[in-house]
Amino acid sequence: WEDTNGNTITKALVGDEVYLCADVTDIDDGATATIKIVEKDDEGEDDDIESVSGKVQDGKIKAKWKVKYTEDNDDTESQKEMEEKGYTLPEYAFTVECEGVESEESGQLDVKDEIVLTVKNFDELKGKTLKLVWKDGSSKEIPIDSEKLKISDIFIGSAYMLIK
């Protein structure tokens, strides 16, 4: 898994564009391979999510994928996570298949429950507080102390913002 800058990653946000990358051997450049993405399950019953294709170039395959939210409700910890957060976070992996041969599974990509907000009018808002409020009434307050606000452990879903 790589980000758009080519850095290896193990975590991403829903909506991030990531690259699925793998070294390949004994496959000619230009050959098309299928990359199968799964949502990992503790019990080994992984859920098929999507397949994308890419061409082998210089002994590597690379394909772009947009991280999506898939409910992970069949792990042993799913119920606990649902009770604590109100949702579950998926973990993804992929395999590459070409000419009838399937690769080993990739490392895992964990979906993070955070957002990064850019404060365009920071000079006006510095020192104030941003309050996020979700449909169920839960909320989180964040001090506006930077032009980039990284907010972790948030709920998935729409929220409205108040500045006070």
Map each language-model feature to its residues.
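Short, acidic Ser/Thr/Gly-rich low-complexity loop/linker segments typical of extracellular
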Residues: 52-56, 138-150
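Structural beta-strand segments of beta-rich domains
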Residues: 16-20, 113-117
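Short Pro-Gly-centered beta-turn/loop motif in secreted/extracellular proteins
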Residues: 148-164
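Short, hydrophobic beta-strand segments
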Residues: 56, 61-88, 151-155
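Short beta-strand elements
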Residues: 99-115
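Short amphipathic beta-strand segments in non-cytosolic proteins
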Residues: 37-49, 131-141
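Short, compositionally biased P/S/T/A/G/V-rich stretches that sit at domain boundaries
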Residues: 1-14
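Structural motif
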Residues: 24-27, 115-129
